[in-house]
Amino acid sequence: MTQISGKARAAARLAAVQALYQADMEQTPLHLLLDEFHQHRLGAEIEDVEYAKADVAFFDDVVKGVDARRDEIDGLLSARLAKGWALPRLDRTMLQILRAGAYELMARRDVNVGTVITEYVDVAHAFFEEREAKFVNGLLDAVAKDVR
């Protein structure tokens, strides 16, 4: 059995969030979205920047899993939002980070809770300031308590 590097999974998580965002914004059918990422994004060089090789199977699992279990995931996230908050109020990128993290906490028991939370906090740092990254940390920690 081959050991998948942490870097490859980190790249897969970031790509999954990007793919989920694209699906949300453009309503791209899942099979076309996955094909686009497989052919043109994962590990590709874009604007002279070479992206890390991603764990393609892990990427596929997160994207397909969020798509298949969106209602369940959104219910978990909604239950943990502060009073007066609803998912549509969240930034769309933030929502995809939370969905991907929640899916991993629910379905990927092979990955420990701390790793999942840390990885999605790192993804949040790619798009947001520290305050929002802390929000990801707190919400995913609460979801983890519900599902693990």
Curated annotation (Swiss-Prot):
Task: Give the matching SUPFAM superfamilies.
Answer: NusB-like
One GO biological process this protein is involved in is: transcription antitermination
Keywords for this entry? Answer: RNA-binding, Transcription, Transcription antitermination, Transcription regulation
Q: Which domain of life is it from?
A: Bacteria
Q: Which InterPro entries does this one have?
A: NusB-like_sf, NusB_fam, NusB_RsmB_TIM44
Q: A single Pfam family, by name?
A: NusB
| GO CC annotation, single | cytosol
UniProt-recorded Gene Ontology molecular function terms? RNA binding
Chain coiled-coil ranges? none
Instruction: Quote the Gene3D superfamilies the UniProt record gives.
Output: NusB-like (1.10.940.10)
Q: What does this protein do?
A: Involved in transcription antitermination. Required for transcription of ribosomal RNA (rRNA) genes. Binds specifically to the boxA antiterminator sequence of the ribosomal RNA (rrn) operons.
Q: Which family does it belong to?
A: Belongs to the NusB family.
Report what the protein is called. Answer: Transcription antitermination protein NusB
From which organism does this entry originate? Novosphingobium aromaticivorans (strain ATCC 700278 / DSM 12444 / CCUG 56034 / CIP 105152 / NBRC 16084 / F199)
